[in-house]
Swiss-Prot record:
<feature type="transmembrane region" description="Helical">
    <location>
        <begin position="441"/>
        <end position="461"/>
    </location>
</feature>
<dbReference type="GO" id="GO:0005768">
    <property type="term" value="C:endosome"/>
</dbReference>
<dbReference type="GO" id="GO:0070826">
    <property type="term" value="C:paraferritin complex"/>
</dbReference>
<feature type="transmembrane region" description="Helical">
    <location>
        <begin position="256"/>
        <end position="276"/>
    </location>
</feature>
<dbReference type="GO" id="GO:0010039">
    <property type="term" value="P:response to iron ion"/>
</dbReference>
<keyword id="KW-0496">Mitochondrion</keyword>
<feature type="topological domain" description="Extracellular">
    <location>
        <begin position="430"/>
        <end position="440"/>
    </location>
</feature>
<dbReference type="GO" id="GO:0007611">
    <property type="term" value="P:learning or memory"/>
</dbReference>
<dbReference type="GO" id="GO:0048471">
    <property type="term" value="C:perinuclear region of cytoplasm"/>
</dbReference>
<dbReference type="GO" id="GO:1903561">
    <property type="term" value="C:extracellular vesicle"/>
</dbReference>
<dbReference type="GO" id="GO:0006826">
    <property type="term" value="P:iron ion transport"/>
</dbReference>
<dbReference type="GO" id="GO:0055038">
    <property type="term" value="C:recycling endosome membrane"/>
</dbReference>
<keyword id="KW-0325">Glycoprotein</keyword>
<dbReference type="GO" id="GO:0015295">
    <property type="term" value="F:solute:proton symporter activity"/>
</dbReference>
<comment type="subunit">
    <text>Forms a complex with NDFIP1 and NEDD4L, in cortical neurons, in response to iron and cobalt exposure; this interaction leads to SLC11A2 ubiquitination by NEDD4L and proteasome-dependent degradation. Interacts with NDFIP1, NDFIP2 and WWP2; this interaction leads to SLC11A2 ubiquitination by WWP2 and subsequent proteasome-dependent degradation. Interacts with COX2 and TOM6 at the outer mitochondrion membrane. Interacts with ARRDC1; this interaction regulates the incorporation of SLC11A2 into extracellular vesicles through an ubiquitination-dependent mechanism.</text>
</comment>
<dbReference type="GO" id="GO:0015093">
    <property type="term" value="F:ferrous iron transmembrane transporter activity"/>
</dbReference>
<feature type="topological domain" description="Cytoplasmic">
    <location>
        <begin position="382"/>
        <end position="408"/>
    </location>
</feature>
Length: 568
């Protein structure tokens, strides 16, 4: 229903299990279907995913900080941080080190900080409203824009899933010394993902502990490579804290843009806003909401600090060992060490170009087989952890946008099939060069989808009717708007550079047509965002107002269990 600001609102006691129906207003009359479905009584079983249990928060009076409470809130941030460690990020890291040395570490640091600030907004939306970003989008946008937005986010998730499958398949191929072909690795990844996804049947904390275990494996394996290579610590610190890039040309600039595109993942905003709902927070109590926001932010800081250090390990290893190395130098070292992969590189004086597969091979040539196998274990952990969180993202997005009751098994079958089929075809009919080359295209795809997460999250967290006193202040609105504009511009530059490299007129025409449609939709979302940021004159004199509710006191949705997600 559409909320009339003049209507008398039901009080807390009368709102019932679906009291948020009144609080979910609309931008315009097209939003008349935005309320939650009415209760059908006890005959309908609750349907949940990830939220079968909620972690209780210990009560401690007169404490501004408690490690017990921090531990209770720990989990969602580390699951979110997996997206900063997926195979796409690892490939971006090693290419950054090989192309620019230590010079772009400050870009990685800046991108991680920007990502942290955006994740803060996503977590706050979930905590304050009790709804994750996809659910809010379902209730706010009209049907056609909502479906387009859902398709764009699904495309980003599928693209990310393909990167994760590629990374896992390459890792399995390296670990088996080539005995398991790439297509075999793809099939193995399908099977083990189903096994891992049902770990939460044994409890939410055990699932979060398993993700923590995978992050620990990445830290140990990539940390081992870091210790083995022994990069210059002064160079690492200089590259991290001195924002400059002397002697950088187009390849280095493109790599810097690629770092931003790889680090800030669109589906991660949807994921994090849903994960925070796994903690017991009484949204009727502003102090509890404020406390939850604080601890979730602290946890996110810790989690992204860990992911940043792991990324620094990878960049530094390839910066120290392989920056400005030529193919001929690598071939000689590989032959001297009797490596079976010496013929992987052309024997010329062109600069070494590396990817996840070649990176492991080169490490094996220079530092022994142990370095290769440990690298592969780290890549496998990155691929497995990120493919699991990607599946959760897909489930939350589908449930939120479509209000669709789908089992996780069916959801995984669908998205995995879409992601696996093209990856499997390339693995069967092409070689590892083409498989790893898909990562470049997929990074561009992720960059294109970024506005479809950043603009909605900034829009809804800036609305006082949605967030009440927890809405973004004027400083956050201005900074957030500038931030979104810069990030989207950087990523569009990345896309333009990629399209120019295609070198075919027909592809230019297709790209131009798609760009017009793409920019039109981004403009629509941006227009709605600017209205939310306070530029009300842009509403063209329409009578509706943007927001979930016309009465801010209902923002907490404190009488509704908004965790309406599907059963397995």
């Amino acid at each position: 229903m559409v909320l009339d600001p003049k209507e008398k609102m039901p009080d807390d006691g009368a709102s019932g299990d679906h009291g948020d129906s009144a609080s979910l207003g609309a931008i315009n009359p097209a939003y008349s279907n935005s309320s939650l479905p009415h209760s059908t009584g006890d005959s309908e079983e609750p349907f949940t995913t990830y939220f079968d249990e909620k972690i209780p928060i210990p009560e401690e009076e007169y404490s501004c900080f408690s490690f017990r409470k921090l531990w209770a809130f720990t989990g969602p941030g580390f699951l979110m941080s997996i997206a900063y460690l997926d195979p796409g990020n690892i490939e971006s890291d090693l290419q950054s080190g090989a192309v620019a040395g230590f010079k772009l570490l400050w870009v990685l640091l800046l991108a991680t900080i920007v990502g942290l600030l955006l994740q803060r907004l996503a977590a706050r939306l979930g905590v304050v409203t009790g709804l994750h970003l996809a659910e809010v989008c379902h209730r706010q946008y009209p049907k056609v824009p909502r479906i387009i937005l859902w398709l764009m986010v699904e495309l980003a998730i599928i693209g990310s899933d393909m990167q994760e499958v590629i990374g896992s398949a390459i890792a399995i191929n390296l670990l088996s010394a080539g005995r398991v072909p790439l297509w075999g690795g793809v099939l193995i990844t399908i099977a083990d993902t189903f096994v891992f996804l049902f770990l939460d049947k044994y409890g939410l904390r055990k699932l979060e502990a398993f993700f923590g275990f995978l992050i620990t494996i990445m830290a140990l394996t990539f940390g081992y490579e870091y210790i083995t290579v022994k990069p210059s610590q002064s160079q690492v610190l200089r590259g991290m804290f001195v924002p400059s890039c002397p002697g950088c040309r187009t390849p280095q600039v493109e790599q810097a843009v690629g770092i931003v595109g790889a680090v800030i993942m669109p589906h991660n905003m949807y994921l994090h806003s849903a994960l925070v709902k796994s903690r017991q927070v009484n949204r009727a109590n502003k102090q509890e909401v404020r406390e939850a926001n604080k601890y979730f932010f602290i946890e996110s800081c810790i989690a992204l600090f860990v992911s940043f250090i792991i990324n620094v390990f990878v960049v530094s290893v390839f910066a120290e060992a392989f920056f400005e190395k030529t193919n001929k130098q690598v071939v000689e070292v590989c032959k001297n060490n009797s490596s079976p992969h010496a013929d992987l590189f052309p024997s010329d004086n062109s600069t070494l170009a590396v990817d996840i597969y070649k990176g492991g091979v080169v490490l094996g040539c220079y530092f022994g087989p142990a370095a290769l196998y440990i690298w592969a274990v780290g890549i496998l952990a990155a691929g497995q952890s990120s493919t699991m969180t990607g599946t959760y993202s897909g489930q939350f997005v589908m449930e939120g946008f479509l209000n669709l009751k789908w089992s996780r098994f069916a959801r995984v079958i669908l998205t995995r099939s879409i992601a696996i089929i093209p990856t499997l075809l390339v693995a069967v009919f092409q070689d590892v060069e083409h498989l790893t080359g898909m990562n470049d295209f997929l990074n561009v795809l992720q960059s294109l989808q970024l506005p479809f997460a950043l603009i909605p999250i900034l829009t809804f967290t800036s609305l006082r009717p949605v967030m009440s006193e927890f809405s973004n202040g004027i400083g956050w609105r201005i900074a957030g708007g500038i931030l979104v504009l810069i990030v989207c511009s950087i990523n569009m530059y990345f896309v333009v550079v990629y399209v120019q490299e295609l070198g075919h007129v027909a592809l230019y025409v297709v790209a131009a047509v798609v760009s017009v449609a793409y920019l039109t939709f981004v403009f629509y979302l941006g227009w709605q965002c600017l209205i939310a940021l306070g530029l009300s004159f842009l509403d063209c004199g329409r009578s509706y107002r943007l927001g979930l509710t016309a009465q801010p006191e209902l923002y907490l949705l404190n009488t509704v269990d908004a965790d309406s997600v599907v059963s397995r």
